[in-house]
Amino acid sequence: MGKKSRVKTQKSGTGATATVSPKEILNLTSELLQKCSSPAPGPGKEWEEYVQIRSLVEKIRKKQKGLSITFDGKRENYFPDLMKWASENGASVEGFEMVNFKEEGFGLRATRDIKAEELFLWVPRKLLMTVESAKNSVLGPLYSQDRILQAMGNIALAFHLLCERASPNSFWQPYIQSLPSEYDTPLYFEEDEVRYLQSTQAIHDVFSQYKNTARQYAYFYKVIQTHPHANKLPLKDSFTYEDYRWAVSSVMTRQNQIPTEDGSRVTLALIPLWDMCNHTNGLITTGYNLEDDRCECVALQDFRAGEQIYIFYGTRSNAEFVIHSGFFFDNNSHDRVKIKLGVSKSDRLYAMKAEVLARAGIPTSSVFALHFTEPPISAQLLAFLRVFCMTEEELKEHLLGDNAIDRIFTLGNSEFPVSWDNEVKLWTFLEDRASLLLKTYKTTIEEDKFVLKNHDLSVRATMAIKLRLGEKEILEKAVKSAAVNREYYRKQMEEKAPLPKYEESNLGLLESSVGDSRLPLVLRNLEEEAGVQEALNIKEAISKAEATENGLVNGENCIPNGTRSENEDLNQEENKRAVEDAKGSSSDSTDAVKK
């Protein structure tokens, strides 16, 4: 994928002879592991911790310089071999070619006219690198013993990639040689480039990604040096931080979920050829054909010969694109910023508000999102704000009053306010909250635009400033939208306009409504941030059903490395193991990891 593929040429053909002892690196990684396993820093201390971790990582990188396995020549020199290998193994290679589109990097260009919805690309399972193929590879024995590898498919896939890269006769060599030698994910940012993200909503995920990656490397360095099942791994004599950073970046920018062979569950996969497609706005047009056992992609739109072929990666924010894919997408119609909100337990009405929220399937405290498009808030956030601003009498009506179920049902529907006063309160609150968030940035929108226009910036610095600017523009838009809504509902209240009343006959209208905010909360496929997704049973059920039904790759099925999903679930477990390792545990086995 081109924007994820802005790379330098690769340098050498084999790993160099080690000039530093494993024991010396083991001591440094133990120190790194201990640092990365310490409790989360307090407010305002994250940058300090990041700098300390980075200092240790740079010390390790300096000692390991020149030890990584890379390839001779330019990346594009290996494209003919990739196409030949793909063709010989049943993939489609007609109708497109790989081309450097400069700003977007490498991508696919149509060599003939392709019609919208035409099947133009398919890749059989045989060519995919998956968690299943990792289990059946040289990594298998260690995988069977290490709980982290078993629980975190993205890490297993990263090690699978490293082991195959270090094996000259690997079946996947033509694919691996065509991958970038470095990426534009924040793992590759210089410290000054990361500094541009200070005070942004995204910086916390950047810190988390860096810390988790460093911790994982330190943990697995010891595993590879001491575990008996790691003796035969081709990484035994050379496993550098540079290697691991490259592998996790390759996986996080390319991984997707596909069904297992029997279709009973999903697994993570790297998909050659298809992963060269760049992103644009649209709909997901890639799926998995279980009958033919292959990944298939149909054209998003008409593509004329000579035009770049785009696909839609999914409804991701620019923060997600920058952090997990290494690019910023201008005019992202799905861009959004996080906003953390919660009902205080000291609130006199906390118990009642918590009960109403529970009936609507919403947690009392969570991460929501403000959106780039109108309306700036989703049905879920609207419902939360309505409950947050309810009076005691309004809460009673939603718990005990007539039509209480209907009232819960319409909480997320903009057509049915709780009261005019409630609407004024919630939009006033949102306006104030977004205004406060804007004040936390160290630069203004105008200053960011000036820097982008008048300074010679690196690609990564440009991405960081664009992300910072984008967050502020969304917040500013939310402030203006909230102010307009506040005044509208204040006028309704002053004029004592009658409140719209919900009736069952309204249901058809609600279901056919275009605007997301008009849909009743319980009918809506909520599109919120990861923290909210995990807290909502409704969303979880819908997502799982869709993944199972479609067997889809791309879109929202990706599991990025280090900031959420599997990693968050395993932080406690991994930390426990990490602390044990840092203390110098003599056990060679990782069986001690508690689930």
From Swiss-Prot:
Alphabetic keyword roster: Actin-binding, Cytoplasm, Methyltransferase, Nucleus, Phosphoprotein, S-adenosyl-L-methionine, Transferase, Ubl conjugation
Post-translational modification: Phosphorylated by GSK3B, which is required for recognition by the SCF(FBXW7) complex and subsequent degradation.
Domain of life: Eukaryota
Pfam families reported in the protein's UniProt record: Rubis-subs-bind, SET
Ranges for domain SET: 94-314
EC class of the enzyme, as a word: transferase
Protein location: Cytoplasm; Nucleus
GO terms, molecular function: actin binding; histone H3K36 methyltransferase activity; protein-L-histidine N-tele-methyltransferase activity; transcription coactivator activity
Compositionally biased region (Polar residues): 10-20, 584-595
InterPro entries: Rubisco_LSMT_subst-bd (IPR015353), Rubisco_LSMT_subst-bd_sf (IPR036464), SET_dom (IPR001214), SET_dom_sf (IPR046341), SETD3 (IPR025785), SETD3_SET (IPR044428), SETD3_SETD6_MTase (IPR050600)
Gene Ontology biological process terms in this record: actin modification; peptidyl-histidine methylation; positive regulation of DNA-templated transcription; regulation of uterine smooth muscle contraction
SUPFAM superfamilies (UniProt xref): RuBisCo LSMT C-terminal, substrate-binding domain, SET domain
GO cellular component: cytoplasm; nucleus
Modified residues (Phosphoserine): 513
Ranges of biased composition (kind: Basic and acidic residues): 573-583
Quaternary assembly: Interacts with MYOD1.
Domain comment, as recorded: The SET domain specifically recognizes and binds actin, suggesting that it does not accommodate substrates diverging from actin.
Functional description taken from the UniProt entry: Protein-histidine N-methyltransferase that specifically mediates 3-methylhistidine (tele-methylhistidine) methylation of actin at 'His-73'. Histidine methylation of actin is required for smooth muscle contraction of the laboring uterus during delivery. Does not have protein-lysine N-methyltransferase activity and probably only catalyzes histidine methylation of actin.
Protein name: Actin-histidine N-methyltransferase
